[in-house]
């Protein structure tokens, strides 16, 4: 065993960190004093230190502007500390009837949200409830920041306890000071005294997957006292992947004196490793030193498994030393040089001026200027922003400049320019206010100035910022013609409604009189809304009045702004040729909206003949069109706002809210997504003489919000570092992120080439722990006709920020998944599939009209529009999923078979004892069963998934797929393959259908045998069964039930020496019962 001597503790640090909480104001707090007001004060609790502000007398919008400072005992673990801020109403300033200070709200902030001094800003936090039944409103404005200051050794070592004691004295009443001091001396001795305390026994610290199970006292103890030796058992990843010593251990103490032998070098940013490499540390009393045992363990799917990456972005679980860039703390800040060019004035005569922007690394030109009507050409306007990549080293270079010059597009003559020193360009970081544009005098060479060719001013602003800047989404990164298709963009899906059309009755129809005898006219109503159409069944005729009745519902999908018209056509289909009897056009915007099941009155609409423009409500004379009167039709129309219009597959749906906003419930949290970048993308196109290239961008979809990152051109390892947020209304939803190759940026308006899919991932929100950052790398997998192919990897950081209390989140699990109308008036499965296809087309058409457009192929891929297509591979995957679900039953049957065969006599005897206890005390059966489930859940906690799972190729049966099955999966409908190929596939499908047919027949036969027990199809078998049942009845009446249960159980568990290898008499009796199989033709 190799041993390594321990090192002595490092000297105490002379740097002390302070946390400052500036309580600014509160707004719209709840009145609690019984007189319509509140006298509020704030209590701040951090690291066992409490402080309070002054009380503001009777003010619902109090302003404090008070600063409270706290000592940070462990700066390295500050990100995991909690800052509790509570607002109370002071009972002393009330009406005298209160016994305690009333609670007005609370805010809980984690240390990862603290900012360094100089980067803080005023942030308003909504006040939260303490319990489900609390009534809280309002918000509180805070400034929170920290700073480090120098402190002497006494202050750093022993001043913490004294300062904490003083803070406790400041908050608590004087009568509690003595008790507090005694309590602190008892449980928090100074460090000088702690060094003399002998250890009672070695502590046991288990570090598992980034979680530390250790008391706070033991953590403080390890900082000042030498620990026993450490034996480390580590499961490391494969050799080609490195893991640093501090990965996935956010709570690990960096000052720990023990060091394992030969530690690997620390990982660099962006390094990846398989999750989870498990490290367990057990402290034992052995000689100094430690052993390391490495066990290589590969993930189940190899290179197709998601991995944890170590990033500089920080956020929680991958690194300890991180900087918070609130609220964009999931991605790395990328600096850009922003140049906003607004307009110019007093320019020399020109036709179409433009601006050139030049640095040492970039050269771009603006679009041609726009001159307002009525203004001279010497005052052009551009209103354009450029975002050029910038590094700190660019500003540090001596003489680095930014040149902005104006030029005449027709003659390419120089109109003047401005030069900036990059070292003097200001740095802007939101929430700083935007820099106001300023006028700069255009300059040129000395000859140009003397000749008068250079004149005028240009209005612009220059600053250095990051991708957080509000000007970044609309900024131009280059002057290429296709730059509009490379910008980032946020889209919103259209608001979709279900349009319910109830066709009731039609009167005064002009039916042809020359019908054959005894022939009833076949009258149908066809409804059409855009590309959607539906037709009713044959109407029933009333012989007395000559009217036709249907009472049939048709449902369509209508999208805002509701500009379409609903067209109703009454057709006579008695003959082969359909005859139009009349039509009516109804604007969708005029249809009544409802959000519940209330009754909507019907209206009569006039039917018009050829040339009519529309039908209005009323009687025969109430039409407003220009065509002849052809009858009238009674309709009940309404826009259903109580349904959720499904445009996604139900199993990957990201939103279940109804259309009507009045029915929305408050959000339960915020989903934050940081799209870091991609690695190892494959070439998707060839340009510049056959050189492979990829122009990748990402699309993320959750709820009604779509986001699109900017396109990184000609890069196989693009880095986006863009962060987006969504409000979460239901945790049982799915976030979808896709990667595409941009083809539209190279095509003109006449040649619209679709973008190529690279891959996508799905993350279910319910699998994320609250307020925890997951920074992972997921493989991008695409199923091609040649098989499964890995197109690269995407790196994302995701966090489900859940500020609400736990009951608010858990209450969502007990609520219905879909809105109320889906259960009161449910829609059929086939009808939902048709409506989903229509909704997908409408969303795709809506997003295709945006700039830059989101292509229909992108929308269909993100919405899984082809998820219901036939595939032999999917059928096999679903079959094995069923087998996996029933595996527990198979395992239980095998376990019982091993028990009854006495494979393990000790276990069988224990089962006998447990069976006796349960039979004699039947009240313990149900509690024992639930206790067993609890134990199973606790046991499987060790094997819980540590990161959100990605696409599983083994579950999808995509590892080894038959080429012909893949070709069949990608075949169109109707098929485009040769007849002999289709015939071979049909024969193969028939063979599979025979197996299914046989299994269904066997199931039916077993059920029919059960029915034959009392159906007298076999008289002798029925007589025997009735006689056996009579004997069992007499025995159960005469013998106690417990005795019968014990006898049956012991008979079932009897030793194999008392068994017969032949089937039992009861099984033979059941197999001899007749079924209906012999009656099949």
Curated annotation (Swiss-Prot):
Recorded topology in the membrane: Multi-pass membrane protein
Gene Ontology CC terms, in alphabetical order: cytosol; Golgi membrane; plasma membrane; plasmodesma
Presence of keyword Acyltransferase: no
Main location: membrane
GO molecular function, one term: metal ion binding
Membrane-crossing segments per the record: 879-899, 916-936, 1024-1044
Record flagged with keyword Repeat: yes
Biased composition (Pro residues): 258-268
Endpoints of the signal sequence: none
SMART domains named among the record's database cross-references: C2 (SM00239)
Similarity remark: Belongs to the MCTP family.
Name of protein: Protein QUIRKY
Organism: Arabidopsis thaliana
Gene giving rise to this polypeptide: QKY
């Amino acid at each position: 065993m190799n041993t390594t001597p321990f090192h002595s503790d490092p000297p105490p640090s002379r740097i002390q960190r302070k946390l400052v909480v500036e309580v600014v104001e509160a707004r719209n707090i709840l009145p609690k004093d019984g007189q319509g007001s509140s006298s509020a004060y704030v209590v701040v609790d951090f690291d066992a230190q409490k402080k309070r502000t002054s009380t503001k007398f009777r003010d619902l919008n109090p302003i404090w502007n008070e600063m409270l400072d706290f000592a940070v005992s462990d700066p390295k673990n500050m990100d995991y500390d909690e800052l509790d801020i509570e607002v109370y109403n002071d009972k002393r300033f009330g009406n005298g009837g209160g016994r305690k200070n009333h609670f007005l709200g609370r805010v809980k902030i984690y240390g990862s949200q603290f900012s360094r001094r100089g980067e803080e800003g005023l942030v308003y936090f909504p006040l939260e409830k303490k319990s489900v039944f609390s009534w809280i409103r309002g918000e509180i404005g805070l400034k929170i920041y920290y700073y480090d200051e120098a402190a002497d050794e006494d202050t750093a070592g022993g001043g913490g306890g004294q300062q904490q004691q003083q803070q406790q004295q400041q908050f608590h009443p004087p009568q509690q000071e003595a008790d507090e001091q005694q309590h602190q001396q008892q449980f928090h001795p100074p460090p000088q005294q702690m060094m003399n305390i002998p250890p009672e026994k070695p502590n046991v610290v288990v570090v598992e997957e980034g979680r530390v199970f250790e008391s706070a006292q033991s953590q403080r103890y390890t900082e000042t006292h030498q620990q026993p030796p450490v034996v480390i058992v580590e499961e490391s990843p494969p050799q080609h992947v490195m893991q640093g010593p501090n990965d996935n251990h956010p709570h690990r103490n960096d000052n720990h004196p023990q060091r394992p032998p030969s530690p690997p070098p620390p990982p660099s940013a962006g390094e990846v490793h398989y999750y989870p490499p498990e490290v367990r540390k057990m402290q034992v009393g052995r000689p100094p030193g430690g052993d390391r045992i490495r066990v290589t363990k590969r993930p189940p799917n190899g290179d197709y498994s998601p991995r944890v990456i170590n990033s500089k972005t920080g956020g929680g679980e991958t690194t300890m030393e991180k900087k918070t860039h609130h609220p964009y703390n999931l991605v790395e800040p990328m600096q850009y040089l922003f140049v906003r060019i607004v307009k110019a004035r007093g320019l020399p005569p020109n036709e179409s001026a433009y601006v050139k922007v030049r640095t040492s690394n970039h050269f771009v030109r603006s679009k041609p200027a726009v001159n307002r009507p009525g203004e001279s050409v010497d005052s052009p306007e551009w209103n354009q922003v450029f975002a050029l990549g910038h590094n700190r080293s660019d500003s540090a270079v001596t003489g680095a400049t930014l040149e902005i010059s104006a030029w005449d597009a027709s003659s390419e003559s120089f109109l003047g320019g401005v030069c900036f020193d990059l070292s003097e360009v200001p740095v802007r970081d939101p929430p700083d206010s935007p820099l106001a544009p300023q006028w700069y005098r255009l300059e040129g060479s000395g000859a140009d100035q003397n000749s008068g060719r250079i004149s005028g001013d240009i209005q612009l602003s220059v600053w250095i910022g990051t991708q957080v800047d509000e000007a970044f989404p609309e900024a131009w990164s280059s002057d290429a013609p296709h730059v509009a298709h490379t910008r980032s963009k946020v889209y919103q899906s259209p608001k979709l409604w279900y349009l319910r059309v109830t066709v009731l009755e039609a009167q005064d129809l002009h039916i042809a009189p020359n019908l054959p005898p005894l022939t009833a006219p076949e009258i149908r109503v066809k409804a059409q809304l855009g590309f959607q159409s539906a037709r009713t069944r044959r109407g029933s005729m009333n012989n007395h009045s000559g009217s036709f009745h249907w009472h049939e519902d048709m449902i369509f999908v209508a999208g805002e702004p509701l500009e379409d018209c609903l067209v109703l056509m009454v057709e006579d289909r008695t003959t082969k040729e359909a005859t139009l009897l009349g039509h009516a056009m109804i604007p969708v915007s005029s249809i009544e909206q409802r959000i519940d099941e209330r009754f909507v009155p019907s209206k009569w609409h006039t039917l018009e003949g050829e040339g009519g423009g529309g039908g209005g409500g009323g009687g025969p004379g109430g039409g407003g069109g220009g065509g002849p009167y052809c009858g009238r039709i009674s309709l009940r129309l309404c826009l259903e706002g109580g349904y959720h219009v499904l445009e996604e597959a139900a199993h990957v749906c990201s939103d279940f809210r109804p259309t009507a906003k009045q029915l929305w419930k408050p959000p339960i949290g915020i989903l934050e997504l940081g799209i870091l970048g991609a690695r190892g993308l494959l070439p998707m196109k060839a340009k510049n003489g056959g050189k492979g290239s990829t122009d990748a961008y990402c699309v993320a979809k959750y709820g009604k919000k779509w986001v699109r990152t900017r396109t990184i051109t000609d890069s196989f390892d693009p880095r986006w570092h863009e962060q987006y947020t969504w409000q979460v209304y239901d945790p049982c939803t799915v976030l979808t992120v896709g990667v595409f190759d941009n083809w539209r940026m190279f095509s003109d308006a006449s040649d619209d080439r679709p973008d190529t899919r690279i891959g996508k991932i799905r993350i279910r929100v319910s699998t994320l722990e609250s307020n925890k950052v997951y920074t992972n790398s997921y493989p991008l997998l695409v199923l091609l006709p040649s098989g499964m192919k890995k197109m690269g990897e995407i790196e994302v950081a995701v966090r489900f920020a859940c500020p609400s209390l736990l009951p608010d989140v858990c209450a969502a699990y007990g609520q219905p998944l879909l809105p109320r109308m889906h259960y009161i008036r449910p829609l059929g499965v086939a009808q939902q599939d048709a409506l989903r296809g229509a909704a997908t087309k409408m969303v795709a058409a809506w997003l295709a009209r945006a700039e830059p457009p989101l292509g229909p192929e992108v929308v269909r891929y993100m919405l899984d529009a082809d998820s219901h297509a036939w595939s032999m591979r999917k059928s096999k995957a679903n079959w094995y999923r069923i087998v996996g679900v029933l595996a527990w039953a198979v395992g239980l049957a095998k376990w019982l078979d091993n028990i009854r065969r006495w494979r393990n006599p000790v276990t069988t005897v224990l089962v006998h004892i447990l069976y006796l206890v349960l039979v004699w005390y039947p009240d313990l059966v149900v509690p024992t069963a639930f206790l067993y489930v609890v134990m199973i859940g606790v046991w499987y906690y060790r094997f819980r998934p540590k990161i959100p799972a990605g696409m599983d190729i083994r579950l999808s049966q995509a590892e080894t797929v038959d080429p012909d099955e893949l070709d069949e999966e990608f075949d169109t409908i109707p098929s485009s393959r040769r007849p002999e190929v289709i015939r071979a596939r049909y024969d193969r499908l028939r063979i599979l259908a025979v197996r299914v047919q046989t299994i269904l027949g066997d199931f039916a036969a077993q059920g029919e045998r059960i029915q034959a027990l009392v159906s007298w199809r076999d008289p002798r078998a029925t007589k025997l069964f009735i006689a056996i049942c009579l004997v069992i009845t007499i025995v159960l009446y005469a013998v106690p039930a417990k005795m019968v249960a014990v006898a049956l159980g012991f008979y079932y568990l009897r030793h194999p020496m008392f068994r017969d290898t032949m089937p039992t008499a009861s099984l033979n009796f059941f197999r001899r019962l007749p079924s209906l199989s012999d009656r099949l033709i």
